[in-house]
């Protein structure tokens, strides 16, 4: 201690056996110095706090950083978290990057050792750092329990940023490649990469890649991933790609809104898809809907007004009334709830199709700065899970009761 004002922080570490659903509050009612009462100015809040698991930290498995979370729950109830393994630094492609998977069979309480789902090593005689693959999105085919991961593979590019160095064309020597892997054993092992670039990319586009996070299975069995592409004028645009034959062939139609990038997709009614998009204009999320798998798009009334953002990736899932404890159709959304910085990671729930997101239906998880990306998945009918880039771990997992979110 020093003379004058002294600052202290309270830090709580959970026991390994503590339930992820544990909540607590912290206060400091008194303090003593040399057995004498000391004056306290309490700058903290007595908000409810929640337990969490740091699934990936800097330095784990020899990697400098882990970024870009995706999360799904398989038909068997297994949680699969995906992310970039950024071996050398936290920077984006092009770099030495593979796709990692963390797997939990006990609702996120514990996680198995990391698996590598996609790597290109020294393909084409170039070093690993010239064969990065990243920004994963993961999808469960709910009809078959086949799990798909889509990611962008970049070959060459001299360690320049792929966003600016991927060029028009179709070959790996000129442009980023859109790659799939699949698992048919609940995420334990993964296939060799499948290149679908020729199925969905326009040769005039500079860059085609997925919207990181997750995709969905529609009620009619159609598989859908969000995508983004930099067109021939170098403007980025968000949209979707889909498969009607269990992932064998993929199709892509039109952009949902220009000058948008990372997006997430949800089926809000049978056959109706909502795309929630990161918008380079800043300030708030763009939202559009389609009834024909992206041939035509309609701006949603909530677009550019209902959900603030600092220009960052976000997550959106739809949960049918029959599939959750509230008995209501839910849209669940997460992002940094701010227009500046990437802080205040918040989960919000809408019960009116995304028109409104009441304050009473919001829970803030992390007020401090981080990279800010997140992905949601229902754990069971009562609980939603979030896998996100927090201020304390590169990949953090938390579980929140729906009854804490829906008032």
Language-model segment annotations:
Residues 13-15, 31:
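Beta-strand-rich extracellular modules
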Residues 27-30, 43-45:
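Preference for long, well-ordered alpha-helical segments
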Residues 3, 16-27:
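Short glycine/proline/serine/threonine-rich loop/turn segments at secondary-structure transition edges
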Residues 33-37:
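Short, solvent-exposed loop/turn segments at the edges of extracellular beta-sandwich modules
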Residues 4, 8, 13, 41-407:
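Asp-box/BNR beta-propeller blade signature and adjacent active/binding-site loops
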């Amino acid at each position: 201690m020093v003379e004058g004002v002294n600052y202290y922080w309270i830090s709580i570490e959970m026991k390994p056996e503590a339930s992820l659903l544990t909540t607590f509050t912290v206060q400091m009612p008194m303090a003593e110095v040399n057995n004498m009462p000391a004056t306290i100015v309490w700058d903290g809040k007595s908000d409810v706090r929640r337990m969490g698991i740091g699934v990936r930290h800097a330095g784990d498995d020899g990697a400098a950083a882990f970024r870009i979370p995706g999360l799904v729950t398989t038909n068997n109830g297994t949680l699969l978290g995906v992310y970039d393994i950024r071996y050398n630094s936290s920077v984006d492609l092009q770099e030495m990057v593979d796709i990692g998977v963390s797997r939990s069979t006990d609702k996120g309480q514990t996680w198995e050792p990391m698996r590598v789902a996609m790597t290109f090593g020294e393909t084409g005689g170039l070093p690993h750092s010239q064969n990065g693959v990243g920004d994963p999105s993961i999808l469960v085919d709910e009809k078959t329990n086949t799990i798909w991961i889509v990611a962008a593979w970049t070959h060459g590019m001299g360690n320049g940023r792929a966003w600016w160095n991927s060029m028009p064309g179709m070959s790996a020597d000129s442009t980023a490649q859109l790659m799939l892997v699949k698992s048919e054993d609940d995420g334990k092992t993964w296939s060799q990469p499948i290149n679908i670039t020729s199925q969905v990319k326009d040769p005039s586009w500079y860059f085609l890649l997925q919207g990181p996070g997750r995709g969905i299975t529609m009620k009619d069995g159609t598989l859908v991933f969000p995508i983004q592409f930099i067109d021939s004028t170098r403007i980025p645009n968000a949209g979707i790609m889909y498969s009607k034959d269990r992932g064998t062939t993929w199709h892509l139609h039109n952009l949902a809104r220009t000058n948008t990038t990372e997006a997430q997709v949800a089926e809000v009614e049978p056959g109706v898809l909502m795309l929630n998009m990161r918008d380079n204009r800043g300030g708030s999320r763009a939202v559009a809907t389609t009834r024909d798998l992206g041939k035509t798009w309609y701006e949603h009334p909530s677009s550019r007004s209902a959900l603030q953002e600092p220009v960052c990736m976000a997550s959106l899932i739809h949960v049918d009334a029959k599939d959750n404890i509230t008995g209501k159709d839910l849209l669940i959304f997460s992002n940094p709830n701010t227009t500046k910085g990437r802080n205040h990671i918040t989960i919000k729930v809408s019960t009116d199709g995304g028109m409104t997101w009441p304050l009473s239906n919001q829970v803030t998880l992390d007020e401090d700065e981080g990279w800010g990306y997140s992905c949601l998945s229902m754990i069971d009918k009562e609980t939603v899970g979030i896998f996100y880039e927090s201020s304390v771990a590169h990949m953090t997992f938390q579980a929140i009761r729906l009854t804490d979110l829906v008032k």
